[in-house]
Structures are given as C-alpha cells and as structure tokens.
Amino acid sequence: MPRFAGFSLPNADLRRKHAAMQKIDEEALAEAYNRALALEKSGDVEAAVKAYEEVLAIDPDDHGGAAVRIASMGRGETPDKAPDAYVATLFDQHADVFEDVLVEQLDYHVPMLVRQRLQALTLGPFARVLDLGCGTGLTGSALRDMAEDITGIDLSENMVEIAHEKDVYETLYVAEVVDFLEDNDDEPFDLVTATDVLPYLGALEALFFGAAENMNAGGLFIFSSETLPADTFAGRSFMVGPNQRFAHAETYVRERLDAIGFDIVELTDITVRKEEGAPIAGHLVIARLR
C-alpha cells in the first residue's frame, strides 16, 4: 500500500491559505468575479481588467486566477506562475470529474505518449520515479510496470486522495512541486515526470534546477508543455495564452535545459489536448541529466 504522506512546509502553507479564504467575503468575491468574467466575455477588455483588479483586492491570494486572466488578455505583467491558491482550488473542485473531462472530453493522452516514447527509445525500467503534478495518477498508472518505486506530488489534496485509492504510488505528498524539490532530502530519482505541469508555470528555471537536484546523473526528465506560433511570443520566453494556461517558446525550453545541465534526448511536437474541439499544440520533451 502507498504511504500517504504530507509534506510539512507546503501543507502548512495550504492550511494558511485555506484559513485566509475563510476570512474572505465570499459573496462579494463571487459577485466581483462574475462581473469581471461577464465583461471579459463581452469583449470589454479594459473594464474586465479593472474588474479583475477589484477581485484581487478582495482576494489577494487569488483563488480564482484573476491575475492569470488579466495576463491572458495581454494586460498587466505576466506572472511567473499561476497562484498556488488558484491551482489548488481549481483541481480540488474538479477532482471527481477530472479524468472524465480531461481524457474523455478533452482527448488528453500525454501519459500514454510518455510510455510509448520511453518504450520506443528502450529507456527504462526505472528504480525510482518522481511524478510531479501527479493529479489522479494518470502518469503513474501508465508507468507502473516500468518502475519499482513511484513517488507522486500534487498541490490538490482531493486529487492526491484519488491517486491514493488507485494503489499506484509507494509515496504521495500534497505539495507545490518546486517547494517539494527545494526541500526534499529523499534518495535521488532515475526518472522525473511532469505532465500537464508547465501550463501552470511561466518561468521554468526553478523547476528545471529542482528536478536536476533530485536526480541521479544520467537520469531522465520528461515533461509536456504547451506552445503557440513563434511570432506570437514576440521575443518573450513564455506567456499566458487565451485559454489561461502558460505557453512556452521552444527556444526558451531548450536554452534553460542546457544551462541547467540537461541534454535533450528528444523534443516532439504533440497535440496536448483539445480546447473547444481545437487541438492545443505542445511538446513532449525527454532530457538526460549530464
């Protein structure tokens, strides 16, 4: 049976955020957020931005992702990541229907692509695997017979509880992935995965460095990302796309991996998922730590 563990520092942060949410005027917040969303949908960008700023004044921790929505409209500063409170709230609320929506409705199959590419390149089996942003255990399940020991990390407690029920992981933590990588003192891993994690992160340096610090030399780091046409970035390394998820320029991903000590084994163009029936372009990257 997996050991369902809580990572003390990130969990303390989550409890503080939950306590802060309890102090918010939820009725006022819902009214302000719905007003901002209606203005955004109407196409009144400037009014929507102002309304989302009012949302942030009520809820500085940003459980509704107002800062990300502002950035998706091309206004304000692009945040380095989606707010932890937003990510935890989003996935806690949707945990029960997550797999049905993501796999069945949005045609998300990245975990199986990970398995297929590892097998095609005859990589593995692996003694120790770290599954960052493990969610309900889709990637862990896809790799279960390729690994002796799998550790899963996710910011959403409800998602981790579902992963725990699957009996896929030896160890599970509720934690923000970069915080975990910074504080972890377990034995290093042979494979680190991060499927559907980068769309909630803008700047990648801390993630890539943390992964490297938790891996054996020669270990593999495999992750998916979303992207946009090169000219859309206008020289930027990353941006929030129209679907409120971070997209990363391929050049940025390549440069950061190399600078931190990874060699790219393979970078493949993929369809990450569908959004309103349209394919979302992305990459599946396999990198080896030097």
Short names for language-model regions:
Residues Q22-A88:
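N-terminal auxiliary segments of SAM/dcSAM-dependent transferases
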Residues E182-V192:
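A short acidic, Gly/Pro-enriched loop at the edge of an enzyme's catalytic core
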Residues D190-L204:
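A short SAM/SAH-binding and catalytic strip from SAM-dependent methyltransferases
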Residues S225-F246:
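Short, glycine-/aromatic-enriched active-site segment of Class I SAM-dependent methyltransferases
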